Swiss-Prot record:
GO terms for molecular function: cytoskeletal motor activity; structural molecule activity. Disulfide bonds: none annotated. Keywords: Bacterial flagellum. This is Flagellar hook-basal body complex protein FliE. It is found in: Bacterial flagellum basal body.
Length: 103
């Protein structure tokens, strides 16, 4: 008799837990502008470091490192840096526009 009583309580608890799971609202992960900007800067830095490492490997004569691969990596690095600079310029211009607005 006592076991049946416990089983009933367990079933009620499991049903309550299932209802709570179904009613739980999953919040999407919050994405902040600062976080995205920092991640983009990190990717630019990683690209530059990879290109620099590739160039150093080519300079010391590591087998399997071709000049065309080095040049492509250096161009990717340069383009990503230029893109980062342009984004910064647009952000500064937008900030200046907002600061020049009259209230």
């Amino acid at each position: 008799m006592a076991i049946q009583g416990i089983e009933g309580v367990l079933q009620q608890m499991q049903a309550t837990m299932q209802v709570a799971r179904n009613n739980a609202v999953e919040t999407p992960p919050s994405v902040s502008f600062a976080g995205e900007l920092q991640a983009a800067l990190g990717r630019i830095s990683d690209t530059q470091n990879a290109a620099r490492t590739q160039a150093e490997k080519f300079a010391i004569g590591t087998p399997g490192v071709a000049l065309n691969d080095v040049m492509v990596d250096l161009q990717k690095s340069s383009i990503s840096l230029q893109m980062g600079i342009q984004v910064r310029n647009k952000l500064v211009a937008a900030y200046q526009d907002i600061m020049n607005m009259q209230v």
